[in-house]
């Protein structure tokens, strides 16, 4: 949806500290971290590479088509991630902290004063994913089908930023 550019605007224009939940979760899935330890407890050593790191490709294939496995992963990783985000916010000296997370959940409301949703028309999202990540159209559609629908996000959000247009248009909405 073009979230990266929106995050850059908050950081560059408003001096915000940006915390990306996906990066926090990845750090928690490194060797010796509680996320990886928990995943191994749930799924066994078969999810590890020879060097002890998570075999992300194999693990993703294992859980992507298995809703129950994905639910178990989320129930482990999400609370760990939000606890780490809360710690980073407490220790931040920035006046504004922006947390980027793919999903809104109970923890989002507990941690964040406002929830913003960056929305983009589906076809523009597909074009951006194909250009920026090299995905096929089919993979983009599959990813989008597995995400909560736009209506859910817009109802939960305090503010919606339409990022279908230019960077300048998004900037005006942020101000």
Show where each model-derived region lies.
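Small-molecule kinase domains that catalyze NTP-dependent phosphoryl transfer to phosphate-bearing small molecules
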Residues: 84-85, 93, 110-111, 131, ...
């Amino acid at each position: 949806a073009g979230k990266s550019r929106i995050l850059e605007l908050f950081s560059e224009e408003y001096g915000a500290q940006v915390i990306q939940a996906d990066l926090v979760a990845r750090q928690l899935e490194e060797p010796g971290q509680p996320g990886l330890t928990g995943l191994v407890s749930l799924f066994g050593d078969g999810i590890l590479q020879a060097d002890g790191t998570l075999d992300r490709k194999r693990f993703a294939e294992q859980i992507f088509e298995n809703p129950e496995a994905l639910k178990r992963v989320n129930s482990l990783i999400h609370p760990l991630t939000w606890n780490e985000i809360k710690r980073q916010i407490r220790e931040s000296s920035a006046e504004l902290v922006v947390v980027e997370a793919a999903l809104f959940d109970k923890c989002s409301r507990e941690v964040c004063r406002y929830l913003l949703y960056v929305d983009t028309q589906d076809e523009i999202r597909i074009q951006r994913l194909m250009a920026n990540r090299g995905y096929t159209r089919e993979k983009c559609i599959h990813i989008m089908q597995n995400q909560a629908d736009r209506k859910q996000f817009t109802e939960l959000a305090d503010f919606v930023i339409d990022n279908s247009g230019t960077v300048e248009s998004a900037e005006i909405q942020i101000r």
